[in-house]
């Protein structure tokens, strides 16, 4: 063995001209990220202990912090086509390099193809021998979705690197809705809870009043956080179920299935019942399904085409009615107003 029989001389050299040792305290993204933990912790639940990875293994705190870092270090003229990394200064990389996350942040699935299903198994054994969730990787998936959402808002409302410039550009709108979502979500939320809180925040936002709901659904669903996605048990990071489905109402808006006005429902708004109306004869019974605004099936009935559809049990709100039968395949919005 060389080490036991010979003397080994080792020379360590430090050349300031070629070796860079950077302090993360000078990395704007890292500084914003760490302050971001205070924002997400203070605004969720009781404001102190509601983002615990030991209670909910889908703890997304690292994701909100990355999102805040990305948003507050946006450059003038930036586009969705420029991928972003986190911690690139501290690692002596370019701002377009990967940084310290599994992939660069980008809505391009060829660059960042991570989705909700990938959170399954994101755990590791720590130095104490305990199996714990990999909160940075889990948060990275959440931030990926939020970053996608930012660029969709930008497509619709425009971009601003200065989120304090005005309240109407897409960058400011999405940041405000994400911030408001923190205040609406329950203690120790899952991805599902976080998604629903952002949807609720958008519905309550007087600038849009729910007009961007389907845009939000499409973004989350594209990464596997669709209508039928399930978080499973909060204490298990291996039982999440992904879904690419969007609410029936959003499918309706996309496909415009009633373009020819071949089908309608009346009265609309309705109180305790409504009727189907078609410009052609309908044979046999029709299956009528009613979905609420979140895409949840709240009523399923089979009725003759001329019979009333009962809505007594439905509270006021906007619904989607889907009617199927022999030669029938229609969808329509319905408002219940009692």
Descriptions of predicted regions:
Residues 245-261:
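Low-complexity, Pro/Thr/Ser/Gly/Ala-rich linker/spacer regions in secreted
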Residues 1-247:
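Extracellular protease catalytic domains of secreted zymogens
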Residues 164-165, 252-253, 296:
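Intrinsically disordered, low-complexity boundary segments flanking structured domains
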Residues 105, 110, 250, 270-272, ...:
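A generic alpha-helix propensity feature with a strong bias for hydrophobic helices
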Residues 256-338:
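C-terminal outer-membrane/trafficking sorting elements
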